[in-house]
C-alpha cells in the first residue's frame, strides 16, 4: 500500500488543470482529461459511496483531498470552467478587486476573472464531496476540514507574486 493507505489517488504535480495526471494505489497512471477539481471530487465521492469496495463500510475512514486550483497563472479557460468564468467575465475590475490596497492597473488584474472562476469551481467541486457525505448518511458522524496552503494577493500590496510575500493576503487562508 502507498504510504500505509488502503486507497491512494494522487495528483501528479505541474499539470495543466484540464489535463492532469494521477497515480493510484497500484502505481497505475490515470489521465482523465477533465478539470482536476471536478475529477478529484468525483473520485472522493465514489470513495465515500464505496462505489468500488475500497473501504470497509463498518469502519471509520480518513479522506484527504488536495486540489491544485486555484493556482496561478489564471490566464485562460484552461485554468477554470466556462460556467464559472461566465460569473465574472463581464464584471468591472472594481467589483472583482475589492480590497482597499488592490492596484487595479497591474497586468495581473487581467487574470482576476479567471482566478475567481477557479475559486468558484473549487467551491462547486467541494460541494459535490459534501453532497456525497450527505447521500451516504455520514454527515452526523464526520468531521470536515477545509484548508489551504496559502492565500492570494491578487494585486494587493502592488505585488505580482501570489504567495511568497509577508503580507496578510498571501498568508491568511
Language-model features: locations:
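Short, structured coil segments at secondary-structure junctions
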Residues: 3-4
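Active-site-proximal cap/lid insertion segments
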Residues: 11-34, 38, 48-173
Amino acid at each position: 500500500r502507498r504510504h500505509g493507505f488502503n486507497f491512494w489517488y494522487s495528483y501528479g504535480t505541474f499539470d495543466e488543470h484540464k489535463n492532469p495526471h494521477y497515480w493510484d494505489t497500484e502505481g497505475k497512471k490515470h489521465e482523465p482529461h477533465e478539470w482536476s477539481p471536478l475529477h478529484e471530487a468525483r473520485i472522493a465521492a465514489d470513495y465515500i459511496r464505496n462505489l468500488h469496495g475500497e473501504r470497509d463500510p463498518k469502519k471509520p475512514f480518513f479522506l484527504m483531498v488536495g486540489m491544485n486550483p486555484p493556482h496561478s497563472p489564471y490566464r485562460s479557460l484552461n485554468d477554470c470552467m466556462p460556467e464559472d468564468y461566465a460569473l465574472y467575465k463581464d464584471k468591472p475590475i472594481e467589483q472583482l478587486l475589492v480590497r482597499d490596497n488592490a492596484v487595479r492597473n497591474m497586468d495581473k488584474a487581467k487574470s482576476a476573472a479567471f482566478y475567481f472562476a477557479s475559486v468558484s469551481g473549487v467551491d462547486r467541486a467541494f460541494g459535490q464531496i459534501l453532497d456525497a457525505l450527505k447521500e451516504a448518511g455520514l454527515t452526523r458522524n464526520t468531521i470536515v476540514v477545509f484548508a489551504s496552503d496559502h492565500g492570494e494577493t491578487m494585486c494587493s500590496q502592488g505585488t505580482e507574486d501570489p504567495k511568497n510575500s509577508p503580507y496578510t493576503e498571501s498568508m491568511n487562508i
